[in-house]
């Protein structure tokens, strides 16, 4: 055990336990509360650099992506009306164009412009936990979010490789690995679909309905770590592997209705809170006093949320306007990908320390604003119609 680990263990234990109570007290969603608490307790020295903490937090992030994958109904996604797929792709295209225009208007760093249209579905898992995952806006957010997530991780992989090797043959190899992996997963999905169609009892053998040995959890965790190992060996983004592992569970073992609840309880009760606390602890509160940090972060936040709201106008024809607006806010929280881009840019010296803190703070602001906006909009427009 690393010396002085007692303090951080006790602190994390208390924060995980107390976060829901504080959330209810100040009427703020739990993830932003955990981020703020992480930042405050790091400032006062109760949370500090610790390799175990970093490892568990990274696992928490990957597990969050795994849970997000489990929320995806792949069959429903594949069979989605073409209008939804087309408008989701149009939403992402408009988002990218608006990001470039905004970056040019405000004379932003190219790295910041790259980060603006990023989409991550990680926090959608927390939203589907809080609200009914069958609500139309969450379904729409997942459809557009999955497409955006794949494109964003592809862009992040290319950016990461380019920052290390430059634009050369090594970059093409990295992109080839990624393309090969995605194609292989698609082929494997088709083969397994045929296999389980011919031998349906095989699914029940792997995950029996009456299970006294927790085979469902064992298989789910095995897939989780197997996909992470594959991504590690290919040197690709781990989040994509964990997300696909979750989708595989949802696609082939949907008969196990209780599994999602079991996995979700472990994630949102332990691993995911540690990840959010770690995000908060990574931000130095002292940097708030530096000139340009808060104003720059607010500028980035406002631009990123605004361009998503504008782009969501193309989604209004699918459902109601309020669903499109809620979808825009739900996709305005690329927390982990934004921090990943900031970290890569800082390590490669492509952005200044000021811009690094702006991006990290903007990622936190986006979660605070978007989750609060969703809560207000849902209470005002969605909840009354559900109760009627």
Region roles according to the model:
Residues 5-10, 59-60, 142-149, 165-181, ...:
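Structural signal for the N-terminal portions of transmembrane helices
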Residues 5-20, 73-111, 167-185, 283-317, ...:
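Entry/N-cap segments of selected transmembrane alpha helices
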Residues 9-18, 150, 157, 161-253:
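Core mid-bundle transmembrane helix pairs that form the ion/substrate translocation pathway
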Residues 14-26, 65-79, 122-135, 140, ...:
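C-terminal ends of transmembrane helices
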Residues 25-26, 40-83, 204-298:
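Membrane-interface junctions of multi-pass transporters
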Residues 28, 70-82, 104-109, 127-139, ...:
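Juxtamembrane helix-boundary/capping and inter-helix hinge elements in multi-pass membrane proteins
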Residues 47, 98-102, 151-166, 223-236, ...:
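Hydrophobic alpha-helical transmembrane segments in multi-pass integral membrane proteins
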Residues 116-141, 148-155, 307-313, 334-344, ...:
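Short helical (or helix-break) motifs at transmembrane helix termini and adjacent helical loops
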């Amino acid at each position: 055990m690393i010396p002085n680990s007692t303090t951080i263990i006790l602190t994390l234990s208390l924060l995980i336990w107390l976060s829901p109570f504080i959330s209810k007290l100040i009427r703020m969603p739990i993830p932003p509360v955990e981020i703020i608490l992480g930042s405050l307790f790091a400032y006062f020295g109760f949370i500090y650099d610790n390799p175990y903490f970093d490892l568990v937090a990274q696992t928490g992030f990957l597990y969050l992506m795994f849970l997000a994958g489990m929320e995806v109904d792949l069959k429903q996604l594949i069979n989605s009306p073409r209008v939804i797929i087309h408008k989701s792709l149009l939403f992402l295209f408009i988002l990218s164009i608006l990001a470039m225009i905004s970056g040019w208007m405000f004379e932003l760093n190219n790295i910041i412009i790259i980060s603006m249209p990023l989409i991550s579905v990680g926090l959608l898992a927390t939203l589907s936990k809080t609200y009914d995952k069958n609500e139309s806006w969450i379904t729409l957010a997942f459809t557009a979010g999955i497409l955006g997530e794949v494109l964003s991780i592809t862009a992040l992989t290319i950016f990461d490789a380019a920052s290390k090797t430059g634009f050369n043959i090594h970059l093409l190899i990295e992109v080839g690995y990624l393309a090969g992996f995605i194609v292989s997963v698609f082929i494997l999905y088709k083969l397994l679909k045929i296999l389980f169609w011919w031998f349906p009892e095989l699914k029940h053998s792997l995950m029996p309905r009456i299970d006294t040995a927790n085979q469902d959890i064992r298989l789910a965790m095995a897939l989780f770590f197997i996909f992470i190992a594959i991504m590690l060996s290919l040197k690709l983004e781990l989040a994509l592997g964990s997300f696909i592992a979750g989708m595989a569970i949802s696609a082939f073992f949907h008969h196990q209705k209780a599994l999602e609840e079991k996995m979700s309880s472990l994630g949102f009760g332990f691993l995911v809170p540690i990840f959010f606390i770690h995000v908060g602890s990574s931000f130095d509160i002292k940097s708030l006093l530096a000139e340009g940090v808060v104003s720059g972060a607010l500028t980035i936040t406002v631009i990123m949320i605004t361009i998503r709201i504008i782009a969501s106008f193309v989604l209004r024809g699918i459902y109601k306007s309020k669903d499109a607006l809620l979808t825009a806010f739900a996709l305005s929280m690329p927390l982990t990908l934004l921090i990943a881009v900031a970290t890569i840019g800082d390590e490669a010296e492509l952005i200044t320390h000021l811009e690094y803190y702006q991006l990290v703070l903007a990622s936190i602001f986006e979660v605070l604003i978007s989750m609060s906006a969703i809560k207000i909009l849902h209470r005002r427009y969605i909840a009354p119609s559900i109760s009627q």
